[in-house]
């Protein structure tokens, strides 16, 4: 174990803590920066107020949390809580298994879901929401553009405020 800096704590097997008020516990963890905490085995927390509690997790930036196993949170106030999830940007949340949320206030909660852009939500398994205020809630659905919603399973909505409701349906254009 190795601790350097001010008020750092390195407690565990082969841990490393450096900076100001950082804590590395567990096995093979590494923290650096200020007020960082890595407690999941092989976890890494860096930056300011970051926390890596999942096994093999990585949190970086400011106020990020990587709690899922093999998860990665980066940016500002992002949370990666699903196993193998990735959250990046600002206020993004990846809670589904192998989910990916990126941008500003995006949410990927379904397994294998992907939300990107601004206020986009991918809430079911295999969904993809991209753009501004888009929602993909049907299983394996895809919403893109501005305010588009793919509600039906396997549906696709694209454009400006397009809504696709039925199974395997497709809506595109302006307010369709």
What are these regions (language model features)?
Residues 1-176:
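Periodic small-residue-enriched repeat registers in elongated scaffold domains
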């Amino acid at each position: 174990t190795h601790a350097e800096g001010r008020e750092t704590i390195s407690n565990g097997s082969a841990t490393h803590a450096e900076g100001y008020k950082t804590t590395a516990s567990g096995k093979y963890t590494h923290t650096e920066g200020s007020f960082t905490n890595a407690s999941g085995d092989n976890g890494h927390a860096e930056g300011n107020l970051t926390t890596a509690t999942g096994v093999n997790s990585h949190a970086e930036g400011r106020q990020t949390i990587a709690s899922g196993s093999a998860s990665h949170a980066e940016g500002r106030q992002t949370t990666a809580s699903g196993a193998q999830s990735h959250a990046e940007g600002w206020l993004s949340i990846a809670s589904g298994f192998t989910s990916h949320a990126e941008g500003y206030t995006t949410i990927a909660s379904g397994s294998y879901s992907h939300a990107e852009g601004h206020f986009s939500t991918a809430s079911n398994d295999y969904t993809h929401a991209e753009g501004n205020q888009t929602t993909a809630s049907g299983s394996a659905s895809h919403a893109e553009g501005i305010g588009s919603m793919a509600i039906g399973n396997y549906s696709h909505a694209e454009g400006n405020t397009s809504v696709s409701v039925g199974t395997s349906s497709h809506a595109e254009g302006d307010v369709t």
